[in-house]
């Protein structure tokens, strides 16, 4: 609804991270996307798809420990309907090990050019993933948004869409009239967004 001219490709990812990365890298080669957006585990994968503009939303860069700390072992129900019809997955210690090994590959090819291509959006009330500081060690374009781990429509409209629009404008050589307001103006004493940020 927000971007009627955009073609969105959102395949089901294999549960095993090596298979997921292979699928994603092949998609990048065949589809040549203008922008890749990934949330949570998808944000972790997105960071490693070098050479393309990317937005990592609440990226799970510590997926192995996130699984154990958030009590995600055993049977888990998918929160979104999958194209393959699968409803659940069994998370084992072996799978957690695979995720730990995959996350060790994050940030392996960060360059000054890559830093300009990657944006991080982090929910200020995310109870699951806390990787803002880790992301900021490697990339400078990171913000907190008012929200939790899952993206809701309000967060998409107020935070994700402006970043998408900014990237699209940059890619197309468009320049919009802009008034810049310091983030300090819209943050409380703890650096969290004030309610006025949503108005």
Description of each model-found segment:
Residues 172-199:
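Eukaryotic N-terminal low-complexity, Ser/Thr- and Lys/Arg-rich leader segments
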Residues 37-47:
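Gly/Ala-rich beta-loop-alpha elbow adjacent to hydrolase catalytic centers
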Residues 53-182:
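The alpha/beta-hydrolase serine catalytic core
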Residues 47-53:
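Glycosyltransferases and closely related glycan-assembly transferases
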Residues 15, 39, 121-125:
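Structural motif
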Residues 1-30, 149:
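Active-site catalytic motif of lipid deacylating hydrolases and related acyltransferases
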Residues 1, 46, 131-135:
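Short, highly selective alpha-helical patches that border small-molecule cofactor pockets
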